[in-house]
A protein has these predicted regions:
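Amphipathic alpha-helical "lid/sensor" segments that cap RecA-like P-loop NTPase cores
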Residues: 214-264
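Conserved small helical "lid"/interfacial subdomain of P-loop NTPases
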Residues: 193-221, 227
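C-terminal leucine-rich, beta-strand-based interaction scaffolds used for sensing/assembly
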Residues: 2-3, 262-344
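Walker A/P-loop nucleotide-binding motif
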Residues: 35-56
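Conserved Walker B catalytic segment
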Residues: 113-176, 184
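A short, basic N-terminal segment
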Residues: 1-40, 331-334, 342-344
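Short regulatory helix/loop adjacent to the ATP-binding pocket of P-loop NTPases
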Residues: 176-193
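Conserved NTP-binding/hydrolysis module of P-loop NTPases
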Residues: 77-106
Length: 344
């Protein structure tokens, strides 16, 4: 039997824990006769399971003949990609849209005003015809960034909604990237789009998963689950290593730390500002009380609150206990102590 866990980002593993509540909210809304929202933004720290969550949504609708699911890349021409994919899918499913198109992405990607207008017109024409055939189109865009392709697509999507096309959109990415996109003056309508912050996985659910896969005691499964802190990538790493070696937890820690550092923590740390790092560093030394953190860094309550909110939204710290901040990522303090130099 193959290892049911994976170390590959974005790959849906055999053994994974569904976020039924959060994903279900999107599906429930989209399935309404008159949906209250047609756009959702999914935010989460690196390794939080954004891509797998999008795959769950895509799988749900791909099995429904009424829906057409398009998974698009944020770093390519989204309008051209949508035209190409919708044309291909329509031909594959023998949907006669009355279109005389023989265009590939390369032909549609010339960045000239007339070509852009033509692509947008073609896409609206396709959506109109799909609407008349009772079809719905779900656009899924992962790793969202604030670039020209995304801005043009988002602007057009607003038009699709006002023209009552049966279109739906789920975009996922890091919190900062989503915020940057929403702050665009021409895209203020995105502020009304609900944001779903991917929460840590349930420790009991992780415990149950480990017990179902491995022949281990309840106490060992709980110990493993608690080590992950509900971080999906850590859940996969620990399960993968346990499957490969069947060593006890203590022997797995060095490789567990190494995988977290290489594939997640180095990048997460590099994206923190100077004050972000100082706050996280102080917390990593065992100072959890917000008053003590402020005292250590000589900063005002207002400033700490601003950074506290941002670090929580990024999924780096946990502020669920009033007056305290702790690290949300498993063994992040070990990484900071060993590899990160911070001057207070």
């Amino acid at each position: 039997m193959e290892n049911p866990f994976t170390l590959t980002f974005g790959q849906k593993p055999t053994e994974f824990i569904s976020r039924a509540n959060q994903i279900g909210k999107i599906i429930h809304t989209f399935d309404m006769e008159n949906p209250s929202n047609k756009i959702y933004m999914v935010a989460g720290v690196r390794g939080s399971g954004k891509t797998v969550s999008l795959a769950e949504i895509a799988d749900h609708y791909s099995s429904n003949d009424q829906w057409i699911v398009l998974r698009l890349s944020a770093d390519t021409d989204l309008i051209a990609g949508a035209v190409s994919e919708l044309t291909r899918i329509s031909q594959f499913h023998d949907l006669d849209l009355g279109l005389n198109l023989n265009l590939g992405i390369a032909e549609l990607s010339v960045n000239k005003t007339n070509d852009s207008l033509e692509k947008e017109s073609i896409l609206r024409n396709i959506l109109e015809k799909l609407k008349n055939k009772g079809k719905k189109v779900l656009f899924i865009i992962d790793e969202i960034i604030n670039n020209s392709y995304v801005k043009v697509f988002a602007s057009n999507f607003q038009i699709y909604i006002t023209q009552n096309y049966p279109v739906y959109l789920v975009m996922a990415g890091l919190f900062d990237n989503i915020s940057n996109l929403q702050n665009e003056k021409s895209l203020t309508f995105l502020y009304r789009a609900p944001k779903i912050f991917l929460e840590p996985l349930s420790i009991p659910a992780i415990t149950t998963s480990y017990r179902s896969v491995f022949d281990i005691s309840p106490s060992e499964a709980v110990e493993m689950a608690k080590l992950t802190k509900g971080y999906p990538f850590a859940f996969q790493i620990l399960g993968y290593l346990k499957w490969e070696t069947n060593d006890d937890l203590e022997k797995l820690l060095p490789k567990f730390d190494e995988e977290l550092i290489i594939y997640a923590y180095e990048k997460i740390w590099s994206e923190l500002s100077e004050l972000d790092r100082k706050i996280v560093y102080v917390i990593s030394t065992g100072v959890y009380k917000t008053g003590e953190i402020r005292e250590k860094l000589s900063i005002s309550p207002q400033l700490l609150n601003t950074y506290r909110k941002r670090l929580m939204e990024r999924g780096v710290v946990n502020g669920s206990v009033r007056g305290e901040l702790t690290l949300a990522l498993p063994r992040f303090e070990a990484y900071i102590e060993m590899y990160c130099e911070v001057e207070l």
